[in-house]
Amino acid sequence: MTITMIDMEVYLVDENLSIKNAGLSHGYSCGCILKLDITSPKKVKMLVITKVTSFQAIQELKPLNAKLNGSDLDTELVKCYNTTTDLTVYKTSAYHRDMPDKEYCVTRIYSVMANIDSKSTIEFYGTTSDEFLSAYPVIYINPEEKYYKVKNKGRLQMRVITPILNSDKLQFMAKGDMYAGVGDDPSIVDSSDSDEETDYDY
């Protein structure tokens, strides 16, 4: 079985902030760590999207793991679907003759609700291997002051996007759901060229 990519996206609904490509640059694992800094009780609504892509057959995803301050956090699987893409239309030259005929993708969408009342850590991950857990990116978020800080820890393609893109709302949200009225002019942070911590307002 050849897996080309396992990936994760996290959407913080009320914060209007998304974390894209939360998977390792090398290796079949995905995840991220959120450090939330608040001073009063807050309910944090999140959508978490996990995807696995293969060129040979549909590959099942392991269930999402989530923790809040070290304790298990409930996740609700709200949607799961498979897609198949015909790649033969791209095999138009000798350069592309080794391209596989089809690409298979499995997508799972989870709803996650966390009740927090102080500084808290939320972890999402697709494996329990210590080798991968130490390599996940860390994002510090202060919802009250509307700022976040990215700490790059191994995933060179991870991005934070705010506000959430309309294209993502249309893909993952039902009509009339909580993203209505949000614009599509995002501020995009790409941490691919830096290993330094960076502060951003949103």
Swiss-Prot record:
Plays a role for multiplication of the virus in different cell types. InterPro entries: Poxvirus_C7/F8A. It holds the Pfam family Pox_C7_F8A. It comes from Rabbit fibroma virus (strain Kasza) (RFV). Belongs to the poxviridae C7 protein family. GO terms for biological process: viral process. This is Probable host range protein 2-2. It comes from the Viruses. Signal peptide: none annotated.
